[in-house]
Amino acid sequence: NGPMRISGGAGTGKTVIAVHRAVELAKRDAAGGREPQILLTTYTRNLADDLRRQVAQLEPRLSFTERLGESGVMVSGLDRVARMILQRAGTEIAPIAQEVIGQPRKQVLTYPRANVWQEVLSLVGGGLPEGLRSADFLESEYEMVVLPQRVATLQQYLRIRRPGRGVALDRRKRAAVWRAIEGYRDRTADLGVTSFSEQLALAAAWLDQEAARGVLRPFRHVLVDEAQDLSPAHLQLLRALVEPGPDDLFLAEDSHQRIYGKKITLSHYGIQVRGRSRRLTRNYRTTRQNLDAAFGILDQGAYEDMEGQAEEHRYVSPRSGPDPLLLHAVDRADELGKAAELLTLWLGQDRDSGLDAPESIAVLVRDRYQRDAVVNGLAQRHVEVRAVDREAVGRGRPVVMTMHRAKGLEFRK
């Protein structure tokens, strides 16, 4: 009867359900004489590639599509879908851009290559109160408040609500923040660039305009894996991609895997799931020992789901395994040395047992800068590993990737 949300920890079967549901909806539509128009999407390209493999394995005869409006199942990241929409809109996006970002831009497909917010802060930061002189704060305010509400003027910004932001802004502070936002928009216009979030917002607004003119929305069903890290602009695009109705939106999420710490409430973006939410508590991937170790960390915090409800994190697991090993290091060199020793030990054990799958061993890090430093540091210690970003995990070496890129993937060690 409308959008549905399932939640659960890593290994509880959320992705399995999403994949089976996509295949079942495609079969059901085909049996009913309707062309399947289904989007199965997630946050990163790595996960999208993995989802496509799983769908093809479950139903080899299923038709995939790479183009909007064609029959079949599209498996893609949302950023890529937004670009398809903007390519279709062409220069006609200008009036939409005026409405969404306050400037009638005709070219919106080029991304910024540098931190424009930091550049703007260096120019206008002196006019901001000390507690607001942060590029991260300005970017977050823009993406969480300004873009979702399509604020184009100072007068609009002075009136809007800012729930959940944690920083109160009076009129004087809002005016100072708005000067920075205007500076950002002017600078990106000069550079001819448009951010990912702006592209998502523009694509959503374009689809809403087309629907108001009687144009059908691109999909009949949209399914989302790893929904907890989607931004407001992502959620607005999801809502715009499919007409409200039975089986329109399906979201799988886990608040404990939220990387960016920005709490989002689905109902604020037209996605009503009240009465259509289910929680999975049986963990098929993680051992009891790993769960116990994780609970020791999670018990120190409080978590909310995508409807703003407090979320408990007690899961059960039928699997048992070794206790997690926590290694203490005095500095980065010591840390790399211990990591190299452990990787060498594991690879040697695999060779002795006849197992040839080094790519099933992963080193997870905080960001891409640490990733590159770890790859170089391990190479200096004669351990060859492979850095993984947007590309698929290759064979032949252990992999090093950020927690962001590892989301939803599974490794042996």
Describe each PLM feature range:
Residues 1:
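Pre-Walker A adenine-sensing motif
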Residues 4-36, 43-58, 62-71, 76-93, ...:
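Conserved helicase motor core of SF1/SF2 NTP-dependent helicases
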Residues 91-173:
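ATP-hydrolysis module of ASCE/P-loop NTPase motor domains
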Residues 116-118, 141-146, 178, 235, ...:
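Tryptophan-centered motif/residue detector
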Residues 119-124, 141, 183-184, 202, ...:
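A general alpha-helix detector
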Residues 193-201:
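Short glycine-rich substrate-engagement loop in P-loop NTPases that contacts/grips substrate
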